[in-house]
C-alpha cells in the first residue's frame, strides 16, 4: 500500500505566512504538520512508500525537507514533460522511501485540484497498488493504523467520517449519507443543507 500525500495547494487564505512556503511544512512545536502525519503513517506495516504530490512552486522546498532526513538519493526522473519529474529518497528518520512528485503548476489559479493531482501522481509513477490518500495540511491526534485495519477487514474502498453536530461546520466540509451498515449512500461537498451529521475529512483508502 502506498501513502499518497496531497500537498499541491497554495494555502492562499493564510496570506504572507504561506505566500512562499507550503502549509504542510509549517512547524507546530518541534515538528511540521506533515512530519507529524508521516511519523504515524510510517509505522503502519502495510505502507511501503510515501508519495508527496505537490506543485512546481513548492516542490524544491519539499525536496529540501525530505533531503534533511536523507541517507541516499535513490532515483530521479525528468521525462519528456518539462514538469513531469519526481525524486525518491531513502530516509534516516522514516523506514519507507519518500517520493516527491511535481505537478507542474505554479499558481493557485492553475492548480489541478486534489483528484487530478492524485491521478497525475499515479500515472507518473505507474502505481498499481492500494492507496492511503491523505491531505497534507491536517493536524491529527489519532493513528491511521485503525483505518487501514478497517479497510483490510471490509476488503473495499473506505472513507473516514466522524459525527459533527454543528451545522455551520458541516457546511464547510464534505458530508456523507450512510445506511445502518455505514455504507455510503451519497456525498456532498460543503452542502448548505447537510443531509446528515457525518463529516468527511480528506482521508481515503
Tell what function each PLM region has:
Residues 4-6, 108, 169, 196-197:
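Short, flexible coil/turn micro-motifs enriched in small/turn-prone residues
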